[in-house]
A protein has these predicted regions:
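Short hydrophobic beta-strand that contains or immediately precedes a catalytic carboxylate
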Residues: 103
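Nuclease and nuclease-like effector domains acting on nucleic acids or nucleotide cofactors
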Residues: 1-100, 109-162
């Protein structure tokens, strides 16, 4: 029997230390019943159902799981992904948007599957409440950096829960 691998690290930007069992999948939860994030959760749920390969969709059964997302910490890629998703939002919704809304993208800008790196048919964008979009972004950052310790290039999935 092989012992599980434990990786310990210190994140350079925040100087926080922690450990992670590498065999334990990193799964970020978003909730449809959380009024602060329900718009993002709904968008992600629909995107995972319609995008090729159910990208990022978590299921305990590997046969029903989508392809993993991989994190990028490269600011140039993150910014390029955000710019590309913004362009795609304006293209798909030329009538514009109301004040207080943000362009939400899935897969996330902080992944190697973001809008600047994949065809438009592998992306989903939608205008949602800015507060909702920012809340999920903040939670995702905490998940990647502190809770799950997902390093640059490592895999993670997203589970939409009730």
């Amino acid at each position: 029997m092989v012992a599980p691998q434990l990786r310990c690290d210190t994140l350079s930007k925040k100087r926080t230390s922690g450990c992670r069992f590498l065999e334990y999948p990193a799964v970020f939860d978003v909730s449809l019943s959380d009024s602060e994030t329900d718009e993002s959760a709904t968008h992600i749920k629909v995107a995972q159902e319609i995008l090729p390969g159910m990208i990022g969709r978590w299921h305990v059964d590997p046969a029903r799981r989508g392809a993993a997302l991989t994190r990028t910490r490269d600011d140039k890629i993150n910014n390029a992904n955000r710019n590309a998703s913004g362009t795609l939002c304006r293209k798909q919704f030329p009538e514009g948007y109301e004040a207080g809304l943000n362009c939400d993208e899935y897969p996330f800008a902080s992944t190697n599957q973001g809008a600047s790196l994949v065809p438009e048919t592998s992306m989903s964008v939608k205008y949602i409440l800015g507060a909702d979009n920012q809340k999920v972004g903040n939670r995702l950052g905490g998940f990647l950096c502190t809770e799950a310790r997902v390093l640059d290039g490592e895999e993670f999935w997203v589970r939409v829960v009730e």
